[in-house]
Design a protein with these regions (language model features):
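Sec-dependent signal peptide recognition
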Residues: 2-9
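C-terminal motif of bacterial Sec signal peptides marking the signal peptidase cleavage site
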Residues: 15-17
Length: 178
């Protein structure tokens, strides 16, 4: 049975304000793959629709690439999903790395929350360092010179993501697998 592969319009997350880590806290973890491969329709709060292809790759990860013709055609992310300790089972951490960057150890990883809403749906909560400063400070993390919140380790990241979940921030994107 096909399930949703909810996925992240992360191009905007690559700018200042995002939550990131260079320490790669999930490097040795196998991701959770709760979704089938397939075609994704993503809708933002502005009702703009973007289409992606999702496929499973090694180590419990996914590769998501944009299928709409245009400037970003073929660009995408490697995605991993992980349980968030202390949160309900339908709340997952997402980790995203841009495919157009080298796979070296210093490639930044971006983080947020994915809420599984149905067998074929999900929503994304994308943290912003400035707007979600209270949640980031839960682990003692503050904005750096580039405006992004860079977490020192996995424990700090998870503590702040749990605080973000508890803040009841509204999701910014919805995803449906077709």
């Amino acid at each position: 049975m096909r399930k949703l592969a909810p996925f992240i319009l992360l191009a905007a997350a690559l700018v200042a304000g995002c939550w990131q880590s260079v320490s790669r806290p999930y490097r040795s973890e196998t991701g959770i793959q709760p979704f089938a491969a397939g075609e994704i329709t993503a809708t933002g709060r502005d009702h703009k629709v973007t289409h992606y292809a999702l496929r499973k790759i090694t180590r419990g990860r996914y590769r998501m690439t944009q299928t709409d013709r245009g400037q970003d055609f073929g660009q995408g992310f490697e995605l991993g999903f992980f349980a968030l300790p202390g949160a309900p089972s339908h709340v997952l951490i997402y980790q995203a790395a841009a495919l157009d960057r080298p796979a070296s150890g210093d490639n930044l990883r971006y983080y947020g929350l994915l809420l599984i809403t149905a067998p074929n749906g999900a929503q994304e909560i994308r943290p912003d360092c400035e707007k979600d400063a209270r949640a980031a400070r839960a682990s003692g993390t503050r904005a750096g010179k580039d405006g992004a919140c860079t977490f020192a380790d996995r424990a700090a990241l998870e503590k702040s993501l749990l605080d973000l979940w508890k803040s009841k921030k509204r999701p910014e994107y919805s995803y449906v697998l077709r």
